[in-house]
Regions:
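Catalytic-site signature segments of enzymes, centered on catalytic residues
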Residues: 144-259, 280-294
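Active-site helix/loop module of the DD-peptidase/beta-lactamase fold
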Residues: 82-86, 100-158, 223, 227-272
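Short active-site loop at a secondary-structure junction
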Residues: 38-49, 71-133, 202-217, 281-284, ...
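N-terminal leader/targeting segments and the immediately adjacent pre-domain N-terminus
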Residues: 2-7, 17-75, 81, 99-105, ...
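Acidic-glycine-rich active-site phosphate/pyrophosphate-binding loop
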Residues: 63-71, 193-196, 265-270
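Catalytic loop of the DD-peptidase/beta-lactamase superfamily, centered on the K-T-G motif
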Residues: 26-63, 145-148, 152-154, 209, ...
Length: 397
């Protein structure tokens, strides 16, 4: 009898533990949703979508608010929008694939590839390597007098609000460049014979000595891939990244997209921006959905061999800067740089993105293998509240 009572007690305890685990599993998503809803409301976002992953599966998928506020169209897993500088991680993957194809190496001098010569007037005898483009120490900088004019808006495709246009004008954004290819733009920007050439397109030298985050330098890597591959960068990434991962609702240019699921991009909860592309589209112009982007995230976190070899992943995620001799203007307290990817000191690897009407973040935890992403259709000056929630969730074992 005593044995029976003991067994009964043990079974009761075991049942309680199992039920507790089930309840925890059921309430954790609700707890995460509550925290995200608080941040969503505090930031006055029109719409947002969050996905958490673990290995090859999605463990959390939830939308908040609207892709179209006026018509109350929910922001869903299939909603499409620009992802800003998260696009630079795609350049990283494309670059490593190009290296596997023996087009060049990270140490290749860009003048060994370009059809015109690039010289930093502040370092006339120096050279610029592909590696320095990937970690933003090349000495090429974003001249705001030119870069903000590289956005191409499509006001006739969708309704927009004049308040948003006025805001863009005040911020210096315009639609004044008529370049239609990376080749045209980079000749005009970097060649002394180019239409936009200026000493202001370059920072101090020598290359490798100073960190200056550069969209144009990032897109230059994509142009180098174009030169060696014979493909447009868009076609190269479709072939080696988007199609292998079945990212069927992702692309680079508005005319190539089905706009049915494209979110409106907002200045605030009411005023809408027109849709837009970028002349330097590789640096921030990928349009994708949370569902498609999660396929990419899971592939990267698992070192998926459909994209790259293990050696390429290792190279892509190797820290570029030493603590003893970092370049000027960078603080390694919170992050180092891989090949475009940010290597955060909290044990995660990722990248964020900003542009008019968008905010994004994508990351994975190198210890747990869990990852997360969020997309919102409004510029978010400070993503930290949302990022902290997701990073903490991904750290759980």
């Amino acid at each position: 009898m005593k044995t029976y009572k003991t067994l009964k007690t043990l079974l009761s305890i075991l049942t309680f533990v199992l039920l507790s685990n089930v309840i925890a599993a059921q309430t954790n998503p609700d707890s995460l949703t509550t925290k995200l809803q608080q941040a969503f409301t505090t930031e006055s976002l029109p719409g947002m979508y969050v996905i958490m992953t673990d290995g090859g599966k999605i463990t959390y998928s939830h939308g908040f608010g609207y892709a179209d506020v006026a018509n109350q169209v929910p922001y869903s897993a299939s909603t499409i929008q620009n992802i800003g500088s998260v696009s630079k991680t795609v350049i990283a993957v494309a670059l490593m694939k190009a290296i596997e194809l023996r087009y060049f190496t990270l140490e290749t001098d860009i003048n060994d590839v370009l059809p015109f010569k690039v010289t930093n007037p502040n370092d006339p005898n120096g050279k610029i390597t592909i590696r320095e483009l990937t970690n933003h120490t090349s000495g090429i900088v974003d001249n705001p007098e030119i870069y903000h004019y590289s956005y191409h808006f499509y006001p006739k495709l969708r309704a927009y609000d004049s308040v948003s246009i006025n805001t863009l004008n005040q911020m210096g954004f315009g639609d004044k460049l008529r370049d239609t290819t990376l080749a045209q733009f980079f000749f005009n920007y970097l060649s002394p014979q180019g239409q936009y050439y200026s000493k202001a397109n370059f920072g101090e030298g020598p290359a490798g000595s100073t960190s200056s985050y550069c969209n144009i330098g990032s897109a230059l890597v994509a142009y180098l891939i174009e030169i060696k591959s014979g493909f447009t960068y868009a076609d190269f990434t479709r072939k080696y990244i988007l199609k292998p991962l079945k990212m069927d609702h992702s692309d680079w240019h508005i005319p190539d997209m089905d706009l049915k699921n494209h979110a409106y991009l907002y200045l605030d909860l009411k005023n809408r921006f027109p849709l837009y592309d970028l002349v330097t589209y590789p640096d921030g112009g990928l349009k994708t959905s949370p569902e498609d982007l999660s396929k990419y995230l899971m592939a990267i976190a698992r070192h998926d061999k459909r994209l790259l070899t293990e050696a390429s992943y290792q190279a892509m995620f190797t820290a570029q800067f030493s603590k003893e001799h970092p370049p000027k203007n960078i603080n390694l307290t919170y992050r180092n740089k891989g090949i475009f990817w940010n290597l955060y000191t909290n044990g995660t690897i990722g990248h964020d993105g900003d542009d008019p009407g968008i905010g994004t973040f994508l990351f994975f935890n190198t210890t747990t293998g869990k990852g997360g992403l969020f997309l919102t259709n409004k510029y978010l000056p400070n993503k930290q509240a949302i990022v902290d929630v997701l990073v903490k969730e991904a750290a759980k074992k």
